[in-house]
Amino acid sequence: MLQKQVSTTTTMTTQELAMEGEKQLEETIEAAFQIISAMNDELCNPSLWSTSATPSSAATTTGSNGSALVSADAAAIDGTSHHSESAGGGGGGGSGNSVLDEASLRYKNSVTSLRAVLAAIPNSQKAKASEMQNGLGSPESEDEIEKLEEQALSLRMEIAKKNVHVKELIDKLRELIADISTWQSPCSV
């Protein structure tokens, strides 16, 4: 499917590529939002929280020193992504895992499509420049090319901003997971 899309992006005009890029950017943002929503749903679902000690965490929490508790908390933080990945194999977990996996796959596909569109824009511009050198272009198309170049630059900047925002949200989510792990760990007296 991606190969077909890449080949069609090379035959599109720069304006069509810009519109396709905008569409792909919107899909990428929507998929990123779905990932965050799915993660939020998992965190808000108490049935997914580990209230009983598993064999591996029981061994680390029964230690008398604080470092064992810290390592159990760190394992809980690292294990959150493992938890969502292991649920896809039918290992158990909430229904939110399939939503998270679907959103993640959708995000990866839309980013790949967006990159293909952005990579095709320079090729389209080169083809347009070649046409202009051969006398097939017009001054109007130069203005159009400049406008589309600005739009492509704007799209790239918007992607960068959205990626920074998604990274910040993921960092906040990690902090929240760490807090939840701390609240769930047994108190040592």
From Swiss-Prot:
The keyword Repeat does not apply. Residues 138-178 form a coiled coil. InterPro entries: MED30. It is found in: Nucleus. The keyword Nucleus applies. One of its GO terms (cellular component) is mediator complex. Component of the Mediator complex, a coactivator involved in the regulated transcription of nearly all RNA polymerase II-dependent genes. Mediator functions as a bridge to convey information from gene-specific regulatory proteins to the basal RNA polymerase II transcription machinery. The Mediator complex, having a compact conformation in its free form, is recruited to promoters by direct interactions with regulatory proteins and serves for the assembly of a functional preinitiation complex with RNA polymerase II and the general transcription factors. PANTHER family: MEDIATOR OF RNA POLYMERASE II TRANSCRIPTION SUBUNIT 30. This is Mediator of RNA polymerase II transcription subunit 30.
